């Protein structure tokens, strides 16, 4: 086992990465190794997808499957080894079908990619795990060095984050053949184990640029189906009655669940990254969407254990449900998996609803505590002139975008301390689950404009980017000249690709934390600092002073 893709990876003087029987996320060595094997199979599939396009062959089933299966290897998504192997078998079967199509057009068609002819050696998981050793990401570290390995992983993990957003967009009926072509090209190239530093840096920027397009179509999918988010108050306390909790990012799953629970007497609560759903008109119209429950994903083993109803996980993040003994009432959807828990294959939430009706639910309603969400792209753009006016009248000094992932590391208290130290004449824009560190606190307003503005899920970084570009255009300056600072917390691969997106768009002087990715060497950090001004958090006092004076 070797896995260094998330922020909580093991870090030692001898090197970084989880390499024992179990990773810090709870992923076993078996599952981790089989995910490496799956990635190799997907690289072979992408290699033939690239070749097929040379013959004018575009298979939408392949384009849909490939990023979805890749998404299953993202942190805290799928811990179920047999399902990972199933994805690998499907990838190989699709690859062979594509290969046959190419050969039907050109009898001499061939693919030079080293993953293009990969076959699984056995049905036995142990044998497959041994085969997977051929594809462990650091197998040639001694030959290529830590810097090249780190750049490879930056590209692989960044592309994995983009693949997750591609799947979210596809679920909503949004896809772009050019994006799929670019995805396959990059995935296939990574399967050649590239070792050119400049080429890898260029690839990382290409992934970032591609992901900007992915976030654009995902935004279009969400707003077309569910309307543009508008500021909405959400209760974060319990309401009497039977209940279901839904977590993850998939708004379509939430919509289907709301439709199927309407009139049943079962209330629905959002959790984690599903919180922004309350801002969408077509979702909040359901009166039994009563509130948001819990805090950051890392607290779920305590909070889920206390929730008096079933729980549905639609995407990341799931962690071991046996710890809180709620594994008999947690349900996984789509690419999510945990051994031994119930998995919903389709869109029918009937079994979940039936379980909710058999459970007690909340015995009484708590005193409401309301927070505000729903500052989507249209709302943000509508406020652009107000922001400019406040800046011109010196009522608004600075905007801080403080967002990203949450996690268990104690150093993440930095982000709470940072936002509570932001001066009263500054605005805080936030997104993703890192906001749970401070989104229940009171920040007041600046002439009626809330000082804490929740822009949505991690992918809604797109809205923040569009706002920044709009402000820069209106002020006749560059984005980096705005009174705007980005302070980002990261945990997994979606955060990595959003960082690449920002860097590829030329955004500079981003501050990140709580620690640097484990695959970043000192040399790579120095390169990113020199090219982009990217740096790690220090102390709240020093960072605040530096950012306000920039």
Curated annotation (Swiss-Prot):
Needed cofactors: [2Fe-2S] cluster; hybrid [4Fe-2O-2S] cluster
InterPro entries tied to this protein: HCP/CODH, Hydroxylam_reduct, Prismane-like_a/b-sand, Prismane-like_sf, Prismane_a-bundle
GO biological process, one term: response to hydrogen peroxide
Residues the record lists as Cysteine persulfide modifications: 405
Binding site for [2Fe-2S] cluster: 3, 6, 18, 25
Catalyses which reaction(s): A + NH4(+) + H2O = hydroxylamine + AH2 + H(+)
Residues the entry annotates as binding hybrid [4Fe-2O-2S] cluster: 249, 273, 317, 405, 433, 458, 492, 494
Key words, A-Z: 2Fe-2S, Cytoplasm, Iron, Iron-sulfur, Metal-binding, Oxidoreductase
GO CC annotation terms, alphabetical: cytoplasm
Co-factor binding details: Binds 1 [2Fe-2S] cluster. Binds 1 hybrid [4Fe-2O-2S] cluster.
Broad class of the protein's primary localization: cytoplasm
EC numbers, comma separated: 1.7.99.1
Subcellular location: Cytoplasm
Keyword check for Iron-sulfur: yes
Role this protein plays: Catalyzes the reduction of hydroxylamine to form NH(3) and H(2)O.
Protein name per Swiss-Prot or TrEMBL: Hydroxylamine reductase
Provenance organism: Salmonella typhi
Upper taxonomic lineage: Bacteria, Pseudomonadati, Pseudomonadota, Gammaproteobacteria, Enterobacterales
Gene responsible for this protein: hcp
